[in-house]
Amino acid sequence: MTKTLLILASVYGFVGVGLGAFGAHALRARLPEERLANLELAVRYVFFHIPALLAVAWLHTLIGGELFEEIAGWSFALGVLVFSGSLVLLALTGERRWGAVTPVGGVLLLVGWGALIGAAIFFHSYTRGVVTYPLS
């Protein structure tokens, strides 16, 4: 999972820079302001979640394949794809139906953050090899 998340974070960074530049230069004069705003939001959310993917990859090297960390990694990976991908499609095509898909990606991102919270709460227990009740 570590290698996969590192690759995804790198691909998302590559795509984010490319889309940001494409939007700022090639599309600025061609798209209405609302659609440009959708593209900018998509790029922003890609970049917000690259550090999260890297953090989960780092956690994976420390504690291995624990449930919260696995859920966080895949939720972030899919959430970025669905959330930002639907906004990019909305921006490029103008098809409003893509906007209906965006909340699904948002929920996946929220699940990822919640799972990362769970991984942080249980982190001390995992590192000692015994799961204990957190915050006790």
Located regions from the model:
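Polytopic transmembrane helical bundles with strong interfacial aromatic enrichment
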Residues: 1-136
